[in-house]
Amino acid sequence: MWRGKKIGIALSGGAARGLSHIGVLEVLRDMGVEAKAIAGTSMGSIIGSFLCSGITLDEMEEYVGSMDWKSFLLFSDLALSNTGIINGRRVERQLKKFLEDKTFDDCKIEFCCVAVDILTREKVVLTKGRLMDAVRASISIPGFFSPICLDGRLLVDGGLIEPLPTEAIKALDVDFIIGSSITFKKDSERYRYLLEENCQLKKDQTYAYHNIGISNNDKFREMISRFRHRVRKNNEKTVSVQSILDTSMNIIHREMASRYTELADILIEPEVGDFGFFDLTRGKEIIQRGREAALAKAGEIKKKLRLR
């Protein structure tokens, strides 16, 4: 191993898909990789803060495995405000169960997380104060979670500027950076398919309206039958509010992440494009994707870090 060298790990955002970082970290642990510093953005800040404050990966996975659809209610408190549809108090209560009132100084592994000052449009790297407050700032997706006021700044999700916090981890004077950044190749295929299917449904509707008279009952019934079949077939695969939100966040992540992935000495990219933004109930599967991505890079990791 790189004796005396400081290894840092950067964990990207990604909402539920960011749970894949747990699988990545498990593989790195089993390989004997010892991180001296961790930086997180959004979901990466949750996982990073938990690990650095002493919560084990096994404990995290156990909690994720216990989630069901009701778990979403534990994080959702609708807010009738102009700043976000979710107030964030329930999220804060859940974070406090794990982080209590621990501060950055209590961390066993050096930690920082990234947020954005929505007023000045500046990146803010948080390194002091209560972990819970810093994480709450880093996960505050604009328009979704209400922003948090911290040290005179109005803070939102760090993924707007630095979705993979390699610059933040580099500032902690690390010698080697491992980045874990989610990717969405399957997502692109899925939404291209949905777009084609929805466009075809529109064409069928238009054709039926303009070209088939009501008097031509056989053709009309055939067209309606085909149309209904396509609707049933795609009943669970429609372009919904969630799919639009998923795709929007993916676009932001893709466009912004490229400049930060280049700073990583090793880049691990869990393929989680077929999972949704809120797929907390599929956490075990998402974690497994992280394991698979890290194992695929095991040879490169061993070579670069001179592991046996």
Where are the language model's segments positioned?
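Patatin-like phospholipase
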Residues: 1-41, 49-308
